Amino acid sequence: MITVQSLSKKYGGFTAVDDVTFTARPGRVTGFLGPNGAGKSTTMRIMVGLTPATSGSAEVSGRRFADLPNPGLEVGVLLDASAQHAGRTGREILTVAQRMMGLPARRVDEMLDLVSLSPDEAGRRVRNYSLGMRQRLGIATALLGDPGVLILDEPANGLDPAGIRWMRDLLRDYADGGATVLLSSHLLHEIEVIADDLVVIGQGRIVAQGTKAELLEAAGTLVRTPRVHDLAGALTVSGLAFTPSTAAGSTDALRVEADPALVGQVAQQAGIALIELRAAEGAGLEEMFLELTADTQREGAAA
């Protein structure tokens, strides 16, 4: 289990992480989402002891990362696949980690097989690896000690579609075996497919968290009309709360906190023709993400 409590990080007058609290539970994949610069990577670095917190705490299985006697046996970490030693071979990197953890030598070959790095690829220096190969090596290193917790920042970067599916299945199986998986990714569809729980961060603060089903169900109704301003007025008169929807860059859509039947009734009574009317949960994670983080987005940034 990962427990983050009232976590904050300040750099001078800039607050990168602001009173963040959430829990990632065993047997579940937790998707950690937010726009670029939202504080995801800083939070993860604090979790694994690479960045000191200004206040608050981040614990793995009830202890700080720095207090774990042999961290690799309890927490598998992949924050930056490009940070591996470029002058070593893939096998050498895994062998160093295997010896530091006190594991049998056979674990190196087991992990190379698991991530589909061939003997030839394992013998190459990392400087000659593609980003996808570095990601596979990083995942192998994270899984080497068979830890009960995984903390992965953008592990799908550089993987082709087949590689992304492989990673998704691997992490799903790992969580189903009882492990805690915390996963950050800008590939919202992949998070939607694999995640059980979601934590959404914007400008260093948590803007939403809960199970994926809960958050998507709370999306309400998506409605589109050329007369969006007239519909907004009718909804206001009816006492229904709504917000502009940013789905697919739309400017004629609203998300209404009511069921589709009621929204359709209001539109009909006002004589307003609708282009689209459906439960917003059908819009999926991208719709929810864009709406929750609308005030924290940089132009063109997805996560």
Task: Write out the residue ranges for each language-model feature.
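Alpha-helix N-cap/helix-start and coil->helix boundary motif
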Residues: 8, 65, 91, 188, ...
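Residues that scaffold the ATP/ADP-binding catalytic core of kinase and kinase-like folds
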Residues: 68, 142, 215, 288, ...
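ABC transporter nucleotide-binding domain
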Residues: 167-257
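C-terminal coupling/interaction segments
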Residues: 255-303
